[in-house]
């Protein structure tokens, strides 16, 4: 599986993991503390380490974590593990974050998501939230033998390639592809307007082209729709209506439904396949796909950020937001100078 290319045996990450309950189907680290980024993040001292823990039973996991790490939680800890798990699963993007935690000498933020919710997001892009994180290079710290999860991780990467190719011209570079892929989960994200440095996607991709290549190389080589000139770093994609229809038909279900919603006239109620056939012949096919992605990401990012006010608590939310705004301000100043 392509994701295994970035499997990490980092001792430091495993030491952090030892502070938490062991029942994890997947644990991964991401962000500027793991992979170098350009822009303001490049000059950060001791950047916060971002982690995601995937668990089969959120109620049981939070119950154990409350015993081990009571101080990590906001006032919601007083409501117990069932309420915490209900908030995790039923609001926002299905993930519960505890930010600004001091652990093993590092400042960390960790999110908890159920295995079932993650698999659904990877396959269908219901929220394109944690699925979006996993379209970029990550460090896998722990992963069990859940074959459904492994298959979903691989499908998410293949869907990212197909979606990005639909928004690109017939010929493009590896870097063009990776920029489109990295930008999928930021498309429509309101945090790109408030709190995130605008060139974030470029800052992620530019220093990490090799890591993106490692993640996607085998998928690009096997994709029958793609001509991958690996040594030249160039690619070609079939832009015929037939080729685009084939690509559209393999997109995640929620993305297909959003395309149908955008294109379907009021009262018509066409089925999805009929709509995709029309879009495949449309010169603006890529723009329609981009708009559909935004319609998934925007509400998801707003709901998740609103939930963060409660899961993090007001004090941590203010501190965390100020760190984000400070990073954005530094990005503006570096461009102006």
Curated annotation (Swiss-Prot):
Record family assignment: Belongs to the TAM41 family.
One function term, GO molecular function aspect: phosphatidate cytidylyltransferase activity
UniProt membrane topology term: Peripheral membrane protein
Gene (name only): Tamm41
E.C. designation(s): 2.7.7.41
Compartments, record wording: Mitochondrion inner membrane
Presence of keyword Secreted: no
Keyword tags: Lipid biosynthesis, Lipid metabolism, Magnesium, Membrane, Mitochondrion, Mitochondrion inner membrane, Nucleotidyltransferase, Phospholipid biosynthesis, Phospholipid metabolism, Transferase
InterPro entries linked: Tam41
Root EC class: transferase
Catalytic activity: a 1,2-diacyl-sn-glycero-3-phosphate + CTP + H(+) = a CDP-1,2-diacyl-sn-glycerol + diphosphate
Protein's pathway: Phospholipid metabolism; CDP-diacylglycerol biosynthesis; CDP-diacylglycerol from sn-glycerol 3-phosphate: step 3/3
Names of the cofactor(s): Mg(2+)
GO cellular component, one term: mitochondrion
Function: Catalyzes the conversion of phosphatidic acid (PA) to CDP-diacylglycerol (CDP-DAG), an essential intermediate in the synthesis of phosphatidylglycerol, cardiolipin and phosphatidylinositol.
Gene Ontology biological process: cardiolipin biosynthetic process; CDP-diacylglycerol biosynthetic process
Name by which UniProt lists this protein: Phosphatidate cytidylyltransferase, mitochondrial
